[in-house]
């Protein structure tokens, strides 16, 4: 059998996000995502994911982001402090994605999903990766479920889950 470190090394050759899948706890990813450092657990929350029926070209997003102003930057230290304090609202406030504005300009549906999640009671909502999936963080199951139901009428790929630590 392979050790966890060996699996993570092999996984990194498959993709930058793969090593995370071997551990799964809350981690700080550095490098291209292959260097992982354990963090305090994520506070309890409900996560709603909605993927609109479009395909986003990651290559095109990266090409466009090179020419776009970066309006937001991650507050890594603030995020770590919020995790250490088990502060869901602090975590949610610090969620950001520097690619979101570029993708949302090209695919307005992304911004529409984000806005609707927040109207539906999400503490925050952010696009995942280069898109088009948007995830919302909810502090209450009923709000999360009602939001999921409201999206299920329009989209096939709607998933509601809970943070596991």
Which residues make up each language-model segment?
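Contiguous, small/hydrophobic- and glycine-enriched helical/loop subdomains that border
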Residues: 1-28
């Amino acid at each position: 059998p392979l050790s966890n470190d060996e699996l993570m090394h092999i996984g990194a050759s498959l993709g930058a996000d793969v090593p995370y899948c071997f551990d799964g706890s809350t981690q700080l990813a550095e490098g291209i995502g292959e260097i992982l450092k354990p963090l305090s657990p994520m506070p309890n929350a409900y996560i709603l994911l909605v993927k609109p029926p479009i395909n986003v070209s990651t290559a095109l997003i990266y090409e466009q982001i090179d020419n776009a102003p970066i309006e937001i930057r991650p507050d890594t230290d603030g995020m770590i402090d919020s995790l250490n304090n088990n502060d869901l609202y602090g975590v949610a406030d610090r969620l950001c994605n520097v690619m979101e504005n570029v993708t949302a300009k090209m695919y307005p549906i992304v911004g529409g999903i984000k806005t609707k999640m927040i109207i539906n009671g999400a503490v925050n909502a952010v696009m995942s990766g280069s898109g088009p999936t948007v995830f919302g963080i909810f502090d209450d199951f009923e709000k999360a479920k009602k939001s999921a139901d409201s999206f299920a009428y329009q989209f096939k790929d709607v998933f509601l889950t809970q943070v596991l630590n």
